[in-house]
């Protein structure tokens, strides 16, 4: 049986965690940052874990993660 393909867009956006979860970065941090408050930009830094309701969909897109 041939190898399954990962969704390349998802592979660039999600990283697998040791416990079976996934981490992702926040949106809204690429451009138009001047009108956003310092507090908002600070809270958008770093990584976030994928919500449990989306976990199955992300896992299906990344079969080898």
From Swiss-Prot:
Gene name for this UniProt entry: rpmI
Pfam families noted in UniProt: Ribosomal_L35p
Coiled-coil annotated spans: none
InterPro entries with a match to the protein in the record: Ribosomal_bL35, Ribosomal_bL35-like, Ribosomal_bL35_CS, Ribosomal_bL35_sf
Lineage start: Bacteria, Pseudomonadati, Pseudomonadota, Betaproteobacteria, Nitrosomonadales
Cellular component, GO annotation: cytosolic large ribosomal subunit
Molecular function per GO: structural constituent of ribosome
Organism encoding this protein: Thiobacillus denitrificans (strain ATCC 25259 / T1)
Keywords: Ribonucleoprotein, Ribosomal protein
NCBIfam families hit by this protein: rpmI_bact (TIGR00001)
Keyword Ribonucleoprotein (UniProt): yes
Protein name in UniProt: Large ribosomal subunit protein bL35
HAMAP family attached to this UniProt entry: Ribosomal_bL35 (MF_00514)
Single GO biological process annotation from the record: translation
Family: Belongs to the bacterial ribosomal protein bL35 family.
């Amino acid at each position: 049986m041939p190898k399954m393909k990962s969704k390349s867009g998802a592979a660039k956006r999600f990283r697998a965690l040791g416990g079976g979860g996934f981490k992702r970065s926040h949106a809204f941090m690429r451009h138009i940052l001047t009108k956003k408050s310092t507090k908002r930009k600070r809270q958008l830094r770093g990584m976030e874990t994928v919500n449990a309701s989306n976990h199955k969909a992300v896992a299906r897109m990344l079969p080898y993660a």
